[in-house]
Amino acid sequence: MSFATLRPAPPGRYLYPEVSPLSEDEDRGSDSSGSDEKPCRVHAARCGLQGARRRAGGRRAGGGGPGGRPGREPRQRHTANARERDRTNSVNTAFTALRTLIPTEPADRKLSKIETLRLASSYISHLGNVLLAGEACGDGQPCHSGPAFFHAARAGSPPPPPPPPPARDGENTQPKQICTFCLSNQRKLSKDRDRKTAIRS
């Protein structure tokens, strides 16, 4: 009578049919890698499904680009450039309109932006002195016949000091301040007088 020796089957074979124990090499590799995965191997179909889910989740979290913001920086740069171009065009248009209001000789004289602002300030002061002097100024130089416009027009400011008496001959006097627009008016008046004199003669 002979007896057959039966080997007991591993318990995991019946409890977990889809899980097979790792070999010694795989077990060592998992220990050396430092991962938290369990020392078992899941069925191939289940692994593929979980890997696809991980990749899809990574794409959603990452947004398809570095930092999760694809194309946002170029759009912001284009918007900033367009805003700067609009601002520059507005400034240039305003300076062009201001330039047309300032009389110069010659009329088509090229002016920089700082020259345009300075001449505009001088022209406003000159027009204010023209209004203050009125017809009392016959020499075409209202800026030298009375107080400066910015002193008279400033609200709450004390009255300007009286003009100094005319200097005598031989006394050292400071050079007169020249207004460009007064000088231009004086030249026009001189030309008109010469023309009238030539017509009469």
Swiss-Prot record:
Basic and acidic residues composition bias: residue spans = 70-88
**Biological process annotations from GO:** BMP signaling pathway; cell differentiation; cellular response to cAMP; cellular response to follicle-stimulating hormone stimulus; cellular response to mechanical stimulus; cellular response to transforming growth factor beta stimulus; chondrocyte differentiation; collagen fibril organization
InterPro entries reported in the protein's UniProt record: bHLH_dom, E-box_TF_Regulators, HLH_DNA-bd_sf
Q: Name one Pfam family in it.
A: HLH
Q: Which SMART domains match?
A: HLH
For this chain, one GO molecular function annotation is: DNA binding
Localization per Swiss-Prot or TrEMBL: Nucleus
Report the function annotation for this chain.
Plays an early essential role in mesoderm formation, as well as a later role in formation of somite-derived chondrogenic lineages.
Q: What name does UniProt use for this protein? A: Basic helix-loop-helix transcription factor scleraxis
Q: Which organism is it from?
A: Homo sapiens
Q: Which gene specifies this protein's sequence?
A: SCX
